[in-house]
């Protein structure tokens, strides 16, 4: 397989979400360990992230809380991220992929404002795509069809990189793409132990492993 495009997820692939969820814990009034434990429990149980919020605050309304938070702290990062949250292997790995002649895209499940936040980082990528802008999110096959459309290459020439089996590896493979499972973040570690992780073309511990892996297959 001659890989021409590498497409990367955002949360826990490019962005370390520790600070983001720490701010949420503070907002919810619970210790960081408590909230992080709740998030991990939901990840292990295959339950949606929002269930962790509702566990520590029954009846939690995400949209209402974000709106109130924005009004109270208009100048803070709140539920968003910035360049300080970028994993240290991101820039070197993306640079190496670009220098190898590969198209590098970002496409992940994120709110609209994640687009400008990523653009502001000046990452060495060809384009940045956000689910809330597209109006379709992973694991919907339509998301991966859109990825292939934006890449302009055949699905088998695209490597999708993410930290989840359910949202990244399996739907990418169903779309005919290659898939890399990144073993970091709560989901990355948990999902690397699932039997379905074997569907990934490669499991990596760092983005730094990608340029060499792709080069060996071109």
Segments from the language model and where they lie:
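Asp-based, Mg2+/Mn2+-dependent phosphohydrolase catalytic module
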Residues: 1-6, 91-218
């Amino acid at each position: 397989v001659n890989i021409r495009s590498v497409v990367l997820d955002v949360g826990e692939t490019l962005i370390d979400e520790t600070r983001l969820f720490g701010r949420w814990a503070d907002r919810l009034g619970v210790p960081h360990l408590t909230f992080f434990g709740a998030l991990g429990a939901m990840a292990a149980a295959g339950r949606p992230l929002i269930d962790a919020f509702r566990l520590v605050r029954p009846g939690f309304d995400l949209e209402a809380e974000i709106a109130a938070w924005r009004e109270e702290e208009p100048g803070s990062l709140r539920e968003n991220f910035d360049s300080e949250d970028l994993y240290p292997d991101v820039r070197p790995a993306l640079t190496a992929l670009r220098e190898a002649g590969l198209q590098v895209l970002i496409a992940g499940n994120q709110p609209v404002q994640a687009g400008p936040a990523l653009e502001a980082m000046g990452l060495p990528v060809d384009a940045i795509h956000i689910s809330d802008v597209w109006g379709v999110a992973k694991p919907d096959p339509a998301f991966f069809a859109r990825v292939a459309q934006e890449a302009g290459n055949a699905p088998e020439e695209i490597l999708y990189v993410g930290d989840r089996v359910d949202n990244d590896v399996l739907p990418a493979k169903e779309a005919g793409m290659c898939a890399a499972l990144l073993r970091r973040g709560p989901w990355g570690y948990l999902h690397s132990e699932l039997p379905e992780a074997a569907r990934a073309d490669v499991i990596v511990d760092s983005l730094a492993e990608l340029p060499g892996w792709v080069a060996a297959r071109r």
